[in-house]
Structure formats: C-alpha cells, structure tokens
C-alpha cells in the first residue's frame, strides 16, 4: 500500500478527519500504513490488545484508546511480533509502547504517544470494537485510518 496522507487529504478534503493536538512518535518498521479500523479501549491493561493482535489482521489497523497513559506500555516486541504473524498493518495507541529497538525491525506500523520500559498489568479488562475518541477524531470500527510521517487521518471508506 503506497500513499501520502497529504495527497489523501487533498483528494478527499470533504470526507477525511485529521487527528490533531497530539505529538505522535513512530516506532514500527513501516513509516506508512493504513486499513480498516478495529478498536480497543483500555487503561494500563493490554489484555484486549494482546487478544486482538492474536487474530487475523489482514488489511486492518488496531486503534487503541489507552487514556493517554505513559505509565506502562500497551504493546512491546512479543505482542507486535504476533501482530506481524497475523497480518496486521499497524497499531495506533493513545498511550505508550516499549521494546522500541525491536519494534523498529518489525514489518508493522506502530505509532504511540511515547515509550516506557514498564509492562502492562493484565486484569482482563477493556472494550472491543466500540467508538473511541482522541486527537479530535472519532474512530469507528469498520471505517478506515491512514498514517504516515505527515500525520494520521480517518475516512468513512477506503481511500487506497
């Protein structure tokens, strides 16, 4: 999948939403990725992130509302490796990751607010496939998200 979010915005100005007001950092081996939105809402518990990334993710991006917490990581190298094996295009986390040197070597996009070496606590909590909001955008399961070094955008239909 080849695209530039700037061009997607220019060509679809009436239908895209741009995530704003957050300083995202890219840690994965892919600079650009996109696909159908799948959502998880959790706070400092990556049980649902691990669960979802263990399923078939071909053509999909997991978007996680982690409440913006940077106190512990919601994804690290082992979960990301499993996501690659299951065909996920990428992961966008309103929260933190860890194992950043290993993430950079994986063929997957990983965008988060930052990194921290502390792992998540697993309490088997979190919600799947619900509307979540951060960065001024509502992420709806079944819609589409595209991310590159220019930013993150959403659209109600596939643009690529």
Curated annotation (Swiss-Prot):
<dbReference type="GO" id="GO:0008428">
    <property type="term" value="F:ribonuclease inhibitor activity"/>
</dbReference>
<comment type="function">
    <text>Catalyzes the aldol cleavage of 4-hydroxy-4-methyl-2-oxoglutarate (HMG) into 2 molecules of pyruvate. Also contains a secondary oxaloacetate (OAA) decarboxylase activity due to the common pyruvate enolate transition state formed following C-C bond cleavage in the retro-aldol and decarboxylation reactions.</text>
</comment>
<comment type="similarity">
    <text>Belongs to the class II aldolase/RraA-like family.</text>
</comment>
<dbReference type="GO" id="GO:0008948">
    <property type="term" value="F:oxaloacetate decarboxylase activity"/>
</dbReference>
<dbReference type="Pfam" id="PF03737">
    <property type="entry name" value="RraA-like"/>
</dbReference>
<dbReference type="InterPro" id="IPR010203">
    <property type="entry name" value="RraA"/>
</dbReference>
<feature type="binding site">
    <location>
        <position position="98"/>
    </location>
    <ligand>
        <name>substrate</name>
    </ligand>
</feature>
<comment type="subunit">
    <text>Homotrimer.</text>
</comment>
<dbReference type="GO" id="GO:0046872">
    <property type="term" value="F:metal ion binding"/>
</dbReference>
<feature type="binding site">
    <location>
        <begin position="76"/>
        <end position="79"/>
    </location>
    <ligand>
        <name>substrate</name>
    </ligand>
</feature>
<keyword id="KW-0479">Metal-binding</keyword>
<protein>
    <recommendedName>
        <fullName>Putative 4-hydroxy-4-methyl-2-oxoglutarate aldolase</fullName>
        <ecNumber>4.1.3.17</ecNumber>
        <ecNumber>4.1.1.112</ecNumber>
    </recommendedName>
</protein>
<dbReference type="InterPro" id="IPR036704">
    <property type="entry name" value="RraA/RraA-like_sf"/>
</dbReference>
<feature type="binding site">
    <location>
        <position position="99"/>
    </location>
    <ligand>
        <name>a divalent metal cation</name>
    </ligand>
</feature>
<dbReference type="GO" id="GO:0051252">
    <property type="term" value="P:regulation of RNA metabolic process"/>
</dbReference>
<dbReference type="InterPro" id="IPR005493">
    <property type="entry name" value="RraA/RraA-like"/>
</dbReference>
<keyword id="KW-0456">Lyase</keyword>
<dbReference type="GO" id="GO:0047443">
    <property type="term" value="F:4-hydroxy-4-methyl-2-oxoglutarate aldolase activity"/>
</dbReference>
């Amino acid at each position: 999948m080849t695209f530039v979010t700037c061009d997607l915005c220019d060509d679809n100005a009436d239908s895209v939403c741009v995530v704003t007001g957050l300083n995202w950092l890219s840690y994965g081996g892919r600079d650009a990725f996109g696909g159908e939105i799948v959502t998880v809402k959790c706070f400092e518990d990556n049980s649902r992130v691990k669960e979802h990334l263990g399923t078939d993710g071909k053509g999909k991006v997991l978007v996680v509302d982690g409440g913006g917490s940077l106190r512990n990581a919601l994804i690290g190298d082992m979960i990301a490796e499993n996501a690659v094996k299951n065909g996920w295009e990428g992961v966008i986390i309103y929260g933190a990751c860890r194992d950043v040197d290993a993430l950079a070597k994986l063929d997957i996009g990983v965008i988060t607010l930052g990194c921290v070496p502390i792992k998540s606590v697993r309490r088997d909590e979190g919600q799947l496939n619900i509307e979540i909001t951060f960065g001024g955008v509502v992420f709806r399961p079944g819609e589409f998200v595209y991310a590159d070094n220019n930013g993150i955008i959403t659209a109600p239909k596939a643009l690529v």
